[in-house]
Amino acid sequence: MGNCCGTAGSLAQNDNKPKKGRKKQNPFSIDYGLHHGGGDGGGRPLKLIVLNDPTGREIESKYTLGRELGRGEFGVTYLCTDKETDDVFACKSILKKKLRTAVDIEDVRREVEIMRHMPEHPNVVTLKETYEDEHAVHLVMELCEGGELFDRIVARGHYTERAAAAVTKTIMEVVQVCHKHGVMHRDLKPENFLFGNKKETAPLKAIDFGLSVFFKPGERFNEIVGSPYYMAPEVLKRNYGPEVDIWSAGVILYILLCGVPPFWAETEQGVAQAIIRSVLDFRRDPWPKVSENAKDLIRKMLDPDQKRRLTAQQVLDHPWLQNAKTAPNVSLGETVRARLKQFTVMNKLKKRALRVIAEHLSDEEASGIREGFQIMDTSQRGKINIDELKIGLQKLGHAIPQDDLQILMDAGDIDRDGYLDCDEFIAISVHLRKMGNDEHLKKAFAFFDQNNNGYIEIEELREALSDELGTSEEVVDAIIRDVDTDKDGRISYEEFVTMMKTGTDWRKASRQYSRERFNSISLKLMQDASLQVNGDTR
């Protein structure tokens, strides 16, 4: 969805090559002209009216807004208390200045319309009232205090196939009621489900209908929306219907059982190609421990042929869900829980920043790491391979699964020679040991912020990564898109610190990302052989 206003300069016509000292147009800072440049003929800007029939105009006449509960791309969710009854709710305040396009505005209108249209359901959050003032649209909703789906799974020490079956059954019941009432959700993902309260028996509730649409039987859609890892192949092909919700639920089920998405890559084009190919991998841990019934259901939910894909009712009728209470109750292992907690793949900016921090480590900080490297380097070559890394980490008390070890190796192996040299190992150690204190991070940020204005801008990022292997415009754009959470087209120190401390998490993917980038990527894929569907290792 929408981006921030203003541009950062422009390129001369027919000159597409970035040059030193010359600003390239900032593709992440776009002026859509909805908030200025228009008017009533007298120089006064037109007022933006979003809702057709809000409950009222002044939310504070009835409610007291309290602490912040969450923050998204378009606004903030607050704790909200009814002044008369003291009942508590959640208030989702959507800032009008963030609604940059007609599509953004229509999404908000439709979200309200759909939530009003949906029947009361124990697993769908209830919309109580709506307000609209000059600055924001306020949606007063049922309060869900139990936290996110994945967070609760991680908090439990014991995670099983039976628990995954119970969650999947709930999600599919939500999909079923949506489809029964002519609503296609289009953005099913774990973050859009919250537990109603903190009790163990709390209901799981769908909370976000911002990308949902009404549909009629047989109606086809072509707009690319959703979150990249959960998109069905037919969305990328621009010809889809409600079957996309079954696919997204299948992706969630896959993640619930193994901790990572089935279709993953480091760039958005790679993600799109993986989705189109639809190759499932049931060989790595913990899949050998997962029942055949569960794997059979995943195959049928993630069938690339939408005509063969199961309906919501057929999923609920599948033996694995029919017998959810008797599904295996054996722990799927700490690996899955750890992956759900954070599946981190470092982007090139983070890799470079880790090397800068490594270069600034004191002798005392670095010496212990170097000693560890020398112990691992049994062949005395000055570099270690993945086997030496595994043995060395085991000696140091780190038992890392083979798949995650390969991810770590790939992240650290900057020159792609299949080995880690001492400097690469130090950078990885900084990441593993969370050694990036404030002083280290400030030095690393200053390395990129060449003009000392407090931001890493596109040109500075491009220049800093110019000597990195595989750094294309697409990679630079993807870094900005991932790290620049306020969408002003540059990376602040706070955004940089967040990236360094949490990594690039596949769970966080904005609507902006999918709408603007996947539109062009789908066109590109339509023109090459990427649309051919291959077999899988199921």
From Swiss-Prot:
Residue ranges of the region described as Disordered: 1-37
Phylogenetic classification of the source organism: Eukaryota, Viridiplantae, Streptophyta, Embryophyta, Tracheophyta
Record-listed E.C. numbers: 2.7.11.1
PANTHER family the UniProt entry points to: SERINE/THREONINE-PROTEIN KINASE
Gene3D superfamilies cross-referenced by the UniProt entry: EF-hand (1.10.238.10), Phosphorylase Kinase, domain 1 (3.30.200.20), Transferase(Phosphotransferase) domain 1 (1.10.510.10)
Activity control note: Activated by calcium. Autophosphorylation may play an important role in the regulation of the kinase activity.
Catalytic activity: L-seryl-[protein] + ATP = O-phospho-L-seryl-[protein] + ADP + H(+); L-threonyl-[protein] + ATP = O-phospho-L-threonyl-[protein] + ADP + H(+)
Record's note on what induces expression: Induced by touch, wounding, and darkness exposure. Also induced by high-salt treatment.
Residues noted as binding ATP in the record, renumbered to the chain: L69, G70, R71, G72, E73, F74, G75, V76, T77, K92
Name of the protein in its database record: Calcium-dependent protein kinase 32
Free-text function comment from the UniProt entry: May play a role in signal transduction pathways that involve calcium as a second messenger. Involved in maintaining Ca2+ homeostasis in pollen tube tips by regulating CNGC18. Functions as regulator of the calcium-mediated abscisic acid (ABA) signaling pathway. Phosphorylates ABA-responsive transcription factor ABF4 in vitro.
Limits of the Protein kinase domain: 63-321
Binding site for Ca(2+) 2: D413, D415, D417, Y419, E424
The organism of origin for this protein: Arabidopsis thaliana
